[in-house]
Amino acid sequence: MKMKTNMKKLLAVLMMLALALGLLAGCGGEKTASEGGNETKPVKIGILQLMEHPSLNTIRESIIEGLTEAGYTEGDNLEVDYQNGQNDMTVMKTAAQKFVEGGCDVIIAIATPAAQAVLSETTDIPIVFAAVTDPIGAGLVDSLEVPGGNVTGTSDEVSAEMIMNLAEEITPGFQKIGALYSSGEDNSASVIANLKEYAAANDLEVIESAVTNSSEVQQAAQYLADKVDIVYSPIDNTVASAMAVATEVFNEQKIPFYVSADSMVQDGGLATYGIDYTVLGKETSAMVARILEG
């Protein structure tokens, strides 16, 4: 089943509040930012982002904006050390060590591998993650209600079933679903497992094309293009960073490409029910502010 050439590009973004996990009882610390006009030393926050791409950048920018709204301003009572993880675990672990040695009050980790890297380096400094699809499966928290340890954060989980229901509304009658994702991202693995369960229950076929880095996305997309009716990609940072090449392939073959983030639609995907990453960033910043305030 091919998408009609005159089909208008659709954006079906569900404006969802991020799932804010319970704050840790032990995460509060002595407030060091100015309070009531009293000058004290700035609070120090480390931000580790998996890689640079629109979704993650939006989260980081919204976190900083949210902290400013909460009264924490860079150059005044807030010091921010931002590190780009370059999608490399060695780089991320080095950055996490830098945060620990530098005495950060809170560490913010954007995306699953970044959070895992930070957690491997400290069990004392409060860690607030953002854009982690499956915090339990990733080994970050014990439960969503009571995270445990020094970790809390916001989740961007969107079930594959929701996206498939959307696909059935827009492009009904598909039988073969292409799954384009990174084999190295735990967040993608859990969603693809959900997709397979949905497919089995609905007599549909899933054809997988997994990548290990963004340079493989074009070839993976070409592999799927002549085998499937639609393609689905979860909230996958590797695919998100290479949306231009993926959408070029699928547009040429007129294959509907469903994604799981609003920014991925803006970068060429057909449609999504997804997280508003500006809202998620603000929710994350609110959690950080509460920790700083003790």
Residue ranges and their predicted role:
Residues 45, 63, 152-200:
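An alpha-beta-alpha
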Residues 85-142, 236-251, 255-260:
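Beta-alpha junction/loop-to-helix N-cap segments that form part of ligand/metal-binding clefts
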Residues 79-101, 209-225:
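Structural motif
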Residues 180, 186-255, 261:
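Pocket-lining segment of extracytoplasmic ligand-binding domains
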Residues 1-44, 69, 73:
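Short, low-complexity disordered leader/linker segments with a strong preference
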Residues 266-268:
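Small-residue-rich helix-loop
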Residues 44-70, 81-90, 184-186, 237-238:
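Extracytoplasmic "Venus flytrap"
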Residues 38, 135-176, 275-293:
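Hydrophobic alpha-helical segments within soluble ligand-binding/sensing domains
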